[in-house]
Amino acid sequence: MSDRTTLDLPAYGLGAAGLGNLYAAISDEQAYATLAAAEQAGMNLFDTAPHYGHGLSEQRIGAFLSKKDYRPAISTKVGRRLVPVGSRDMPDNGFESPAPFIPEFDYSAKGIRDSFVSSQKRLGVDVVNMLLLHDVGEKTHGDAHEAVLAQALDEALPEMAALKAEGKTKWIGLGVNEIEVCERVLDRIDLDVLLIAGRYTLLEHDNSLPFLDECNRRGVRVIIGGAFNSGLLVASGNEPLRYDYVDAPEWAVERVGQMREACAVYDVPLPAAALQFCGAHPAVTSVIPGARSAEQVHQIARWTEMEIDPGLWNLLREKCLISKTVPVPS
């Protein structure tokens, strides 16, 4: 069993994909203000990746930290290398005005180490608290999934373990949107942590609950990303309704509407219920909602601190909107 006692994480951290201009561009100044607000709110875990803005998110975090003594826990990822765009067309990965690089999958041992060294330079750090293998899974790789998984098991994860042994990171694990690949990897390799995005949420948890229960039994820590299901659980007004990074399906929109009505009975904002729900499972060590402005961070902090009447969880169960057996805040 890995030593998982060496890293204390806050209950809530910051998902930094938005700092890489996910969906819309923000200025450097807005990114720095977002990070400063997270520091003020005690959200002392920044989760980033080379993929986010093609290096831009890491660059902005590095620039922010270079001017301060503040040292949050940092999580970044490997599995893609950034290649100068040159004369090629920039791919549409959902990031507006990304840095001039193209992310290319590379799960080889050399690719993992080269990616990590590049992240060190962008972040301006020698050591990261967590190093996660990014986006291994069938939905990402399709027909190539089995070959990718084999290389991840044979090369990528052993190289990450070597980086951990060298003191370059404290924890290693996966950063994924799929439960099945987590199960398959854990059958072969003892990991410290799993960052699971969008699969354990107020809206969607029936399929993932047994796996989180197993993580708790095995002592594998879980970080929850995508607590708002790509923004669907927090969208208001005329904001786009997204689920799993694409337009939300009708069933999801309808179910979220029913949840919002139940929350209104207890005068609880749906996003507050969504965040606090994710953190209630004993396997979960941190929840990392994304934010792209100081105002959003301050709002998230208010939601996490809000007292929620236990009657809300009972009502959601009565309406069959959450599992009868899922842990809820007490």
What are the residue ranges of the model-derived segments?
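N-terminal binding-site loop/beta-alpha segment at the start of enzyme catalytic domains
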Residues: 1-84
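Short, well-ordered coil/turn segments that N-cap beta-strands
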Residues: 6-12, 42-44, 69-72, 125-129, ...
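Conserved, mostly hydrophobic/aromatic
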Residues: 14, 31, 46, 61, ...
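Short, acidic/polar
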Residues: 25-38, 108-122, 177-184
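Short, flexible, mixed-charge acidic loops at enzyme active sites
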Residues: 84-95, 236-241
